[in-house]
Amino acid sequence: RSLLLSAGERISMSLLALAINEAGVPATAFTGAQAGLRTDGQYGKASIVGVVPERVARAVREGSVAIVAGFQGLDYDTDNVNTLGRGGSDTTAVALAASLGADVCEIYTDVDGLFTADPRIVPTARRITSISSEETLELAAHGAKILHLRAVEFARRYHVPLHVRSSFSDKEGTWIHTSKQEDTVEAPIISGIAHDRSNDKLTIVGVRDQPGFAARIFSLLAGAGVQIDTIVQDVATAGNGFTNISLTIPEGYAAAAQEVLAGAKEELGISDLQFNPNVGTLSLVGAGMRSHPWVSAKLFDALFQAGINIHLISSSEIRISVVVDDDRLDDAVRAVHTAFDLDADQIEAVVYGGTGR
């Protein structure tokens, strides 16, 4: 299966090499295996465990343009072709840049970089000129689609600067820096807003407020392979002895979560499982917010003024996320974007290729 799935990239790299050679520039095509990319054994969603790009480096030294098929590598144990899953091509590019000691890894897409919000929802979103890898990770993890989370994680781990730009324009894109930047007076407090419709809300009602019960619940979910995004536990009512735990989980894991918890309702004394698939998450991201306590007040006031109810709230040092009704998510993004003065005076975002990436 992986051999078949990787065929498209192999054909594309070969055709591109032929075209470049015909234009009078030497070019050499490499499969992931030929480029020295080794993976673990998780077929279809493998991780890169090593890169030895000797042939790629030699081709470049000899004046050839090296073209490497993304999304694939060689299983470290079996030497079989393996595929990397979502974000595999971006991650391949970053891995090669790191192993070759490149000054920068440029990721080409169909827009001029990262924007303060999805331009399809907020046409006046601003282009972000520079952003930290930590902020980019938060945006990517909470719905921003331009750059995949795995690629950003790899870049941060190996200190590879990223430049995200358009394939159809010479404009400067967005620089993602991995070194710690000094805070300045001019530094933006908020970098951007991400939104995500791919999570469902599950509330576990009537959990005993005693040591061990929450641990048992999350052990069951982990055993079923359920991924969890947000966790919120209510404070137990005085004298009641029970609490509620609310989760947001990727929609593909909802059935497994409900099944495993339903089977343990009697054991754990759970009184009810409440499932809501009609929710969306808005995440406000910015390294500057940690020293500005008014940020959360402005966020909640903007949602209040727009008449939007909040289901759940979670946060990190540089992010505040709120779960709202799905049919009000776009309104929430626009309201918060305007409240934090992120709107541009004119439309900056242009989708050149229409791929939606």
Language-model-detected regions and their locations in the chain:
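Nucleotide/pyrophosphate-binding catalytic subdomain
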Residues: R1-V152, V324-D325, A344, V351-R357
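Short glycine/serine/threonine/alanine-rich loop segments
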Residues: V25, A102, V160, V226, ...
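Short hydrophobic alpha-helical runs that function as membrane-insertion/retention elements
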Residues: V104-Y108, L162-V164, D229-T230, H311-L312
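Acidic-aromatic/histidine active-site loop/patch
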Residues: A155
